[in-house]
């Protein structure tokens, strides 16, 4: 016989269903479940006296014959494509199904088979997202990677060689020897990693050897001389090898203005870092490149969102990161030219309009790599408070705004860097790089981080306790982060030229080399999901005011933010 229960009781037992709404942490962002792929009355749940037991929700099917390795039950998926309740199957480290799990011998509508060889992760009342992708990493110290992972980031792309002065300032790994050494070190870390080589050269030879040596991208940085000649040469070589180019333009306008840089692009696709300009770039109007079809614009997180403290902290950060001397007037003027409250305020709004497509950190080099996800949602919340609902949303929910913002650190950087077939979203056929969150801690502190189908990190209580929850609770690496499980569940992204050669053998690495692809003519700003707007942008050279299609973009700095001190008292 059937039994009718209230929505609140159902949500407590199996998680929210269609029409239920969930607040994201302490923000004003509300999501509403669009669809429930499970079957009422046939839900699967693990535990004593629950459904997933032999002959009930668990079948006799072997893994060889189709039972999943792992099932995440009754999770609320939040992704660019939807906000959907479902069971999620993982097999051989890959997401193989999103739908209804159970035992097809006794249950209807089952498309995910639970067998004796299936493990269960309880997703009831939890939010499931794709692992984050931080595409602006200064590899200054290896300890960064653990901090990023514990925040929900599972893929990192950038450059550097450790705490050298070149790495403090620029995301470039120079030359094939350094690239090789960095890739060899990557076997120690349970995340996907990629190296950007130095793109500043006026002739192709040095760039080609870095690409063939394992770089998956090239980075043009003003501290190495981002001249029109270097830009043109770098993009020409990148076109030949199908890799992405990232650019930090000329703050001092020594070799040209923003118009000269755009001319050097020649309409070719390029990823523009910290497009607002506080992180570097043509002062005061680099932000204008966000209006171009061929530019994939991103932000770094220290300016996200604009608060009453943003301006004050930036000057000191900049002096340290770019090896400047405050006693030299020219160095001080260089620093001050980059920090403009008007363009930082406009950056908030351009994110909300979908004109700035991606979010990243700029780790330890004017950015906090453990806060990419936090600051994305702080920006979304600030814009909800200041600008109200987006036209695509209703009074009931902020679903479209949430989809827009989550795309900024998941699918869009994956598209920009040619790896979206493998990572970047919760979709079948992709690597199971997943993060499970309690709604009250969404965006701040994950419940569980899954990498390539294995749990690699989670908050864990005293290992000597009788149960897993007693204090002190710390984020800790799990079994998936050790031994050969680590190298089997994560990859190194590289160029097609490097992957096709003998690089893995020559370097003696265990991780699989995965080539990037389709990052040149095949993509443009239109490829940036929910973030493809190209308004005409103008910057007043005297006041620094920014206008989009003639409308002044301005907003007040935030006095208080969500996802902040109340979550970090201990």
Curated annotation (Swiss-Prot):
N6-carboxylysine: modified positions: 219
Keywords assigned: Cytoplasm, Hydrolase, Metal-binding, Nickel
Catalysed transformations (reactions): urea + 2 H2O + H(+) = hydrogencarbonate + 2 NH4(+)
Any single GO BP term: urea catabolic process
GO cellular component: cytoplasm
Pathway linked to the protein: Nitrogen metabolism; urea degradation; CO(2) and NH(3) from urea (urease route): step 1/1
Binding site for Ni(2+) 2: 219, 248, 274
Bilayer-spanning residue ranges: none
Main location: cytoplasm
Cell location: Cytoplasm
Listed GO MF terms: nickel cation binding; urease activity
Required cofactor(s): Ni cation
UniProt EC number: 3.5.1.5
Binding site for Ni(2+) 1: 136, 138, 219, 362
Positions with a binding annotation for substrate: 221
Keyword Cytoplasm: yes
Domain Urease intervals: 131-570
Similarity comment: family membership: Belongs to the metallo-dependent hydrolases superfamily. Urease alpha subunit family.
Name of the protein described by the UniProt record: Urease subunit alpha
Organism: Rhodopseudomonas palustris (strain ATCC BAA-98 / CGA009)
Highest classification ranks of the organism: Bacteria, Pseudomonadati, Pseudomonadota, Alphaproteobacteria, Hyphomicrobiales
């Amino acid at each position: 016989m059937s039994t009718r229960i209230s929505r609140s009781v159902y949500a407590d037992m199996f998680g929210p269903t269609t029409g239920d709404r969930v607040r994201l942490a302490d923000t004003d962002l509300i999501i509403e479940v669009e669809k429930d792929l499970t079957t009422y009355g046939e839900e699967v749940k693990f535990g004593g006296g629950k459904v997933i037991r032999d002959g009930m929700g668990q079948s006799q099917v072997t893994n060889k014959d189709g039972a999943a390795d792992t099932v995440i039950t009754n999770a609320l998926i939040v992704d660019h494509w939807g906000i959907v309740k479902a069971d999620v199957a993982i097999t051989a480290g890959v997401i193989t199904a999103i739908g209804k799990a159970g035992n097809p011998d006794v249950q209807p509508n089952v498309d995910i088979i639970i067998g004796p060889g299936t493990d269960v992760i309880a997703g009831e009342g939890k939010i499931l997202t794709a692992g984050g992708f931080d595409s602006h990493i200064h590899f200054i110290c290896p300890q960064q990677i653990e901090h990023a992972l514990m925040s929900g980031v599972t893929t990192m792309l950038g450059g550097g060689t450790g705490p050298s002065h070149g790495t403090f300032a620029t995301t470039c790994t120079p030359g094939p020897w350094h690239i090789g050494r960095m890739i060899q070190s990557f076997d120690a870390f349970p995340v996907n990693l990629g190296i950007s080589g130095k793109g500043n050269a006026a002739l192709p030879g040095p760039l080609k050897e870095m690409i063939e040596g394992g770089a998956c991208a090239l980075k043009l940085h003003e501290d190495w001389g981002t001249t029109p000649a270097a830009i043109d040469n770098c993009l020409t070589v990148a076109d030949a090898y199908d890799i992405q180019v990232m650019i930090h333009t000329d703050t001092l306008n020594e070799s040209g203005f923003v118009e000269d840089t755009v001319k050097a692009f020649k309409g070719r696709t390029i990823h523009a870092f910290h497009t607002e300009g506080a992180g570097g770039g043509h002062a005061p109007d680099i932000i204008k490149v966000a209006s171009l079809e061929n530019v994939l614009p991103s932000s770094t997180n220290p300016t996200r969102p604009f608060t009453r403290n943003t301006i004050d902290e930036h000057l000191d950060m900049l002096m340290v990161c770019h090896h400047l001397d405050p006693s030299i007037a020219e160095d001080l003027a260089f620093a001050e030219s980059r920090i403009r409250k008007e363009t930082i305020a406009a950056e908030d709004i351009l994110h909300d309009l979908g004109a700035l497509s991606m979010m990243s950190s700029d780790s330890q080099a004017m950015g906090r790599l453990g806060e990419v996800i936090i600051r994305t949602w702080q920006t979304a919340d600030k814009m909800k408070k200041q600008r109200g609902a987006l036209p695509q949303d209703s009074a009931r929910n902020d679903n479209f705004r949430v989809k827009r913002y989550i795309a900024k650190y998941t699918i869009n950087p994956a598209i920009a860097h040619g790896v979206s077939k493998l990572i970047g979203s919760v979709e079948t056929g992709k690597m199971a790089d997943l993060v499970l969150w309690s709604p009250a801690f969404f965006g701040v502190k994950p419940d569980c981080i899954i990498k390539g189908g294995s749990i690699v990190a989670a908050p864990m209580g005293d290992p000597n306790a009788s149960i897993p929850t007693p204090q002190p609770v710390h984020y800790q690496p799990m079994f998936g982060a050790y031994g050969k499980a680590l190298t089997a569940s994560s990859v190194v992204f590289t160029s097609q030229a490097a992957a096709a050669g003998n690089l893995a053998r020559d370097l003696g690495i265990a991780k699989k080399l995965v080539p990037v692809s389709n990052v040149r003519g095949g993509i443009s700003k239109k490829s940036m999901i929910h973030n493809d707007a190209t308004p005409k942008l103008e910057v007043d050279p005297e006041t620094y005011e920014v206008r989009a299609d003639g409308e002044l973009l301005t907003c007040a700095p935030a006095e208080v933010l969500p996802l902040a001190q109340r979550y970090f008292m201990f």
